[in-house]
Amino acid sequence: MGRDTIAEIITSIRNADMDRKRVVRIASTNITENIVQILLREGFIENVRKHQENNKYFLVLTLRHRRNKKRPYRNILNLKRISRPGLRIYSNYQRIPRILGGMGIVILSTSRGIMTDREARLEGIGGEILCYIW
């Protein structure tokens, strides 16, 4: 039985954010590196470092948190896995959903690599919907 690395990184980031951890470490693969670069570019995380330990590579992510102590803590990241190994979800570029009216992003796996919903609409290609982030 294979591992779902996308679900693992989504769960790790979500759990670290709920526990108010500043740093989270995830396994480094080509897919996880592409997803993390999208998160960094869109401003959902602050920093990424590649770390090697015992000939295995890890990505060390620095999460973005609110520093306002007056209001109750609110999670910055809401991540939801959509397509999974048992049920793949595909969409053409016209039917890619908009999250919160364009405030969130959809991460897609396309024939031209992993990209956001905005990039896929501009290029006019669809693909497998990996996750929603808002």
UniProtKB/Swiss-Prot annotation:
Keywords: Chloroplast, Plastid, Ribonucleoprotein, Ribosomal protein, RNA-binding, rRNA-binding. PROSITE patterns: RIBOSOMAL_S8 (PS00053). It is found in: Plastid, Chloroplast. Pfam families: Ribosomal_S8. Its main location: plastid. GO terms for molecular function: rRNA binding; structural constituent of ribosome. One of the primary rRNA binding proteins, it binds directly to 16S rRNA central domain where it helps coordinate assembly of the platform of the 30S subunit. This is Small ribosomal subunit protein uS8c. It comes from Atropa belladonna.
